[in-house]
Regions:
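Non-catalytic terminal extensions that flank enzyme cores
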Residues: 1-27, 47-50, 164, 242, ...
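N-terminal Rossmann-like or analogous alpha/beta NTP/dinucleotide-binding catalytic cores
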Residues: 5, 11-127, 222-236
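Short, histidine-centered active-site or binding-site loop motifs used for metal coordination
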Residues: 20-24, 54-56, 204, 208, ...
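Active-site cores that bind ATP or allylic diphosphates and position pyrophosphate for catalysis
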Residues: 109-110, 114-243, 248-255, 263-264
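Short, polar/flexible loop-turn hinges at active-site or ligand-entry regions and domain interfaces
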Residues: 81-82, 109, 215, 267, ...
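Hydrophobic alpha-helical scaffolding
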Residues: 60, 88, 216-220, 266-271
């Protein structure tokens, strides 16, 4: 009987495709491993897939030793990726393709505001007690005359965000989340050197990699409305989001190296077993002594 109930349950639960996507700008500490573990376990619970993506688009800060340490930590704790590991640095042609698509369809545009102009705009808004945001100077609109294109400024690419209404989604941890659309503004999706920005590449990759469920730290909650703008502009489906509380230091701030947090492999060097680290990370899920 119980086996039949389990089989019915497994058929009804949608197989989740999840991921963990660290940036190799430093080591992976216990907080990151915990988030990865939640993502891994959710995929396995639903007979789905867990994927690993290395977000290495920041050439100035990337650290090859950090990449190796991340991969070693995942191997040690027994959380292998179910698919080939993706590296964002190898996907720039893909990002350019979708940026060009947005430009061609009128969902993105070139902005020629200089750094000095942007700084002056910010200073003016702050002096008026306003939230600093882009003012749409270069946003094309019916009946609007755009400024003359300057010779000395390489443009950035901005996506057209909605100017009215709300951006809403249901978070699997926090419930219904609503953001005023006019607080998102037309954010940059490609820098003046052509490099795509974080929120753009994350949304594109999650869509193309087939993510159904995105489990990540709640420090990414504010990124979600921007990523939803990208999903909608490109016609992608929006995954389910689960924003997990982070491990904090005694003062309530995000745990960091300054607080004595060590990298994942540091626990191995100290003689900890991977099973012990695994169980410690699962305490929030209700695992404890005797269970």
């Amino acid at each position: 009987m119980y086996g039949r109930i389990r089989d019915i349950y497994n058929k009804r639960v949608t197989m989740a495709i999840t991921r963990f996507a660290p940036s190799p700008t430093g080591y992976l500490h216990i907080g990151g491993l915990r988030t990865a573990l939640y993502s891994y376990l959710w995929a396995k619970k639903t007979n789905g897939e867990f994927k690993l993506r290395i977000e290495d688009t920041d050439n100035a800060r990337n650290n090859e030793d950090a990449v190796r340490a991340i991969l070693e930590a995942f191997e040690w704790v027994g959380m292998p990726s179910d698919c080939e590991i993706e590296y964002q640095s190898k996907r720039f042609d893909i990002y350019k393709k979708y940026i060009d698509k947005l430009l061609e369809e009128g969902n993105a545009y070139k902005c020629y505001m200089s750094r000095e102009e942007l700084d002056a705009l910010r200073a003016k808004q702050e002096s008026n007690k306003e939230t600093p945001r882009y003012d749409g100077t270069w946003r094309p609109e019916d009946g609007k005359t755009l400024p003359a294109i300057p010779d000395s400024v390489e443009p950035v690419i901005r996506i057209k965000a909605p100017t009215t209404g709300t951006i809403e989604f249901t978070d699997g941890v926090k419930g219904t989340m609503r953001f005023d659309a006019n607080q998102v503004d037309d954010f940059v999706i490609a820098r003046s050197n052509g490099a795509p920005t974080y929120n753009f590449v994350v949304a594109v990759d999650d869509a193309l990699m087939g993510m159904t469920d995105v489990l990540r730290g709640d420090d990414h909650l504010s990124n979600t409305p921007k990523q939803i703008v990208v999903y909608n502009a490109l016609g992608f489906g929006i995954p389910k989001f689960f924003h997990i509380p982070m491990i904090n230091n005694p003062s309530g701030k995000k745990l960091s190296k300054r607080d004595g947090a060590m990298d994942g492999m540091g626990y191995k060097r100290l003689g900890f077993l991977p099973e012990a680290l695994f169980k410690f990370s699962c305490k929030d899920l209700g695992w404890s002594k005797g269970k």
